[in-house]
Amino acid sequence: MIKEYSIGGMSCAACSASVERVVSKIPGAEAASVNLSTERLTVRSERDLRAEIFAAVEKAGFTISDIQSIKKQSAIDAERRKKDMRQRKINLIIALVFTIPLFYVSMGHMIGLPIPKFIEEPKAFAITQILLLIPVIYAGRGFYVRGLKAVFALHPNMDSLIALGTIASIGYSVYSTVLIFEGHHELMHEGLYFESAGVIITLVMLGKYLEQRAKAKTGDAVSALIGLTPDTARVIYKDGTEHIVNADELVVGERIRVFPGERIPVDGIITEGTSSIDESMLSGESIPVDKNVGDKVIGGSVNTSGSFIYVSDKVGDDTVLAGMIRMVEQAQGSKAPIARLADKISGIFVPVVAAIAIISAVIWLIAGESFGVAIKILVSVLVIACPCALGLATPTAIMVGMGRGASMGIFIKNGEALEHTCGVDTVILDKTGTITCGKPDVVDIKPNGIDKGLFISLFACAEAGSEHPLAAAVTSYAGKNGIEYRNPDSYTALAGRGGRAISNGKELLVGNDRLMKENGIAFDEKAFEALTMSGSTPLMLAEDGKYLGIIGVADAVKPDSEAAIESLRSHGIDTWLVTGDNERTAKNVADKVGIKNIKSSCLPEDKNGFISFLRSSGKHVAMVGDGINDAAALASADVGIAIGTGTDVAMASADIVLAHGELTGISNAIMLSKATLRIIKQNLFWAFAYNTLGIPIAAGLLHAFGGPLLSPMIAALAMSLSSVTVLANALRLKVVKLK
């Protein structure tokens, strides 16, 4: 059996690894997998191990709870994330409030800033810094708890580097403070490094806060999907009375009435009435689907016209929408986090540096140096190997890269997305709202022996009583072109065919070929076929049985789509058009923009499966879409790119949002990611270069040949220089050319 649990208290990969490790040791547990981003534990076992799993996880220092229904669990997760972010914000504010004066007190005299007289006294100078540092340490206590725990577990991480580096600075500073109280006042300006510890803790806390804020938004996609389900439903009891009930309480077999404009609560089959249903949340297509008795309706879709009664056949977590939610969750969860080079190296770097520091101190003691000199060497090695530059190497480049992207209308949600985008070699594009404008428009007009203006006026009059998107396209066209039309005296919708309007005593029939044939009206079949072949939807108009002409309504291609596809091709990137539309419509659009690879008639699960197929074939896939139906595909791709003019669900599921809806942003995002990754590698090189060159000197290499002994202050300066180099290099991303 496979069970899922919600885990709380995890902050890094080491935490998730700890949970996996303790659960895997439980007898009977065949496999345990933790997803850090969704905070879920999945366990495969032969029997129910709930009690043992709860005990093991709680003993490891984490919280665990059962997974509730999708809707309830979403609310629980949202509240927990909100509480965590609130605490992080409070801790960050505390750290900032005390770090700023700490830095001022310790460094102000070096640049001529005035400081209070009493602080000029050595003892007061040291004690003031200690008092200011204590709240900062308290605010950043999580680094020490997680970092030291990882060290003791023999799995050091970035928190371990932060903890050991700042402990070294604080430890030496406390030692110097003791000497100051013994009369060594010269250590006042060369033995105290409290501000280094405070600044490091605060900067890292700021970075973690921003990282967690971005991570918290990954749940927005699921929340938005859950929001599609109405809270209540109108149930018809056996005695014929209707009652409003909680949608969560619905069971299979209940009769439910849905009025125009309402969302359908659960899946089912229509038993009475007809309607047009907006299923864009499933198919992504903007044109409603006509439904009759016996047709299936999907929970979360919108009834655009007509009242109907249906019988529920899937409720709760068994509905199509619930399946889509699970797909998004699983897709988000299946993304392996980018291999964080700094974290990997720190597993070796930390113990090696600690060993070098201890060995160096012991060697100099054996060589006859004093304990004070040995301590100075020990601290110098740890301080010069402080992970500040190492910790800044990746996040600073990512932050600047994100800022550069934002200035271009490319909003990158997190650093992982930016790094993933670098390797994209295949781009999958949805049609509606992505390559096309996303709404029907009149693209062709063929009057039959009647003035074009009068034809459009009569057509708009006939459609003015309809709420159908195709009708709206006609009336919108008339309005944009200054063509006046009157509202009909009456209008009757004809499901699956069109509509009948009465105006000035004349009958206007507007709709498809089926309507014309039913009423014995001859129409231009060649024009009808030509429009159909071009991918347009043909609409015809007849007045009192006389055919007046035909128009074509289609979703127009965006002006920049062709240029965007050409830009991707020039960079050696394959493009695919994957859509829910039929093959003819898909090919017509693909030909217009220059896409050669087409996959049509795809449901959301088909898109998801196709992406999985490409990825298993070694492709690095980016998915570009704008609709709710694209949510799972956006999440399952290596990189999800949403059009800013699309739905909130698509944007929440995506890694990158093109705010202006311009497809040329795809190639810009890829080039930006490559430039950023290049800067990250350079930063890591310089960070380690400073450390590897500085450590031998800090260990006393120069002193062994009669040279000076490196003081912790110079070590701290070297550490600062490495940070400055990393920051300056990252800032180059603001001006680097994207080729």
Regions found by a protein language model. Give the residues of each.
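Conserved catalytic phosphorylation-site environment of P-type ATPases
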Residues: 282, 341, 376, 389-462, ...
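Juxtamembrane coupling segments of multi-pass membrane pumps/enzymes
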Residues: 76, 198-260, 291, 341, ...
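Conserved ATP-binding TGD loop and adjacent catalytic N/P-domain core of P-type ATPases
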Residues: 17, 253, 412, 424, ...
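P-type ATPase nucleotide-binding
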Residues: 442, 446-571, 583, 595-605, ...
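Transmembrane helix-loop-helix hairpins at the membrane interface
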Residues: 87-232, 344, 445
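Conserved cytosolic catalytic loops of P-type ATPases
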Residues: 28-45, 50-51, 55, 194, ...
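Membrane-embedded alpha-helical bundles of multi-pass transporters
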Residues: 111-124, 152, 171, 404, ...
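Flexible metal-binding regulatory segments at protein termini and peripheral loops
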Residues: 1-126, 149, 241-242, 322, ...
